[in-house]
Amino acid sequence: MEAPLVSLDEEFEDLRPSCSEDPEEKPQCFYGSSPHHLEDPSLSELENFSSEIISFKSMEDLVNEFDEKLNVCFRNYNAKTENLAPVKNQLQIQEEEETLQDEEVWDALTDNYIPSLSEDWRDPNIEALNGNCSDTEIHEKEEEEFNEKSENDSGINEEPLLTADQVIEEIEEMMQNSPDPEEEEEVLEEEDGGETSSQADSVLLQEMQALTQTFNNNWSYEGLRHMSGSELTELLDQVEGAIRDFSEELVQQLARRDELEFEKEVKNSFITVLIEVQNKQKEQRELMKKRRKEKGLSLQSSRIEKGNQMPLKRFSMEGISNILQSGIRQTFGSSGTDKQYLNTVIPYEKKASPPSVEDLQMLTNILFAMKEDNEKVPTLLTDYILKVLCPT
């Protein structure tokens, strides 16, 4: 199949006069001949493509001629192409920028762009400077700029290091201003023990202050170097004594912390078991109400049936079995699902002080046995009464 023919004679005849009438508008004459001679010899072959486009006979010829023209244009990369595509001057660039500033679309696209404060991107030397840096260096510079900017915005300033005296003063203020809620709940005897412990703490703080003063006065290498042997020995004894005192205090505080944690666990377990027993007692009460209601309905229906039926014999096997079953229910409970020890009442005597950890442990064991309906409930309850309520 032959390629379609192209008839361009009439169109180019119409274009020639328009190009001749307005010679100043040279870019509008796309297919006209070049009005001036090309200076570059490598582009001299383009002069042969002046009016030959009119003699094209098919699309294939048009494509081939276009390929040849491209090859001629891109043969020499160093050739000057200002005659073919003139570069815009500075005035035209400024006019385009002014028109872009009035465009709403351009403003919407460029509002989120924040240039770097340390670099002016309009500087022509900035491209050469950035070209010599690698991507990692550029990335590091950007991170440094971002960190500096965030620090300046947030106003973060490094606090100066505190001396030992300042730290001790802050600790004293914290201990004086922060009341301990546990000490308020303790009895008078424990308060006396707390006063003695606070006095011991104040003594330790005084020793720390005296020790730090000696350290601050003689901490430098030169100060220690000029001290005599007896002074160094005395200072060493002070340091070792302070270390022993602080170690003992640390051990006591850690032991106290362990005791408080254990007491907290015992209280939590007691509260948990108590809530579980109360929930089970509530379920059992609801179940008993339901059974009583069903029993009342069954008795009412049985009375109606007995009125319609003949009276049974006085001493029958059915009557004897019913009597035995009712006696067993009254002795051991109505059914095997009833909890025998769930509703056990635990005697408790309210005192001025809260129950101790040992008392809470005994109560927790009793409640756990009640929840499981264990046979150990009477034994545990007896031990609790003898040891807590009526100690010998």
UniProtKB/Swiss-Prot annotation:
InterPro entries: FEZ. The modification Phosphoserine is found at S58, S298, S316. Pfam families: FEZ (PF07763). One of its GO terms (biological process) is hippocampus development. Residues 230-298 form a coiled coil. Mainly expressed in brain. Belongs to the zygin family. May be involved in axonal outgrowth as component of the network of molecules that regulate cellular morphology and axon guidance machinery. Able to restore partial locomotion and axonal fasciculation to C.elegans unc-76 mutants in germline transformation experiments. May participate in the transport of mitochondria and other cargos along microtubules. Homodimer; disulfide-linked. May form heterodimers with FEZ2. Interacts with the NH2-terminal variable region (V1) of PKC zeta and weakly with that of PKC epsilon. Interacts with UBE4B. Interacts with SAP30L. Interacts with SCOC and ULK1; SCOC interferes with ULK1-binding to FEZ1. Directly interacts with SCOC and UVRAG. Stabilizes the interaction between SCOC and UVRAG during amino acid starvation. This is Fasciculation and elongation protein zeta-1. It comes from Homo sapiens.
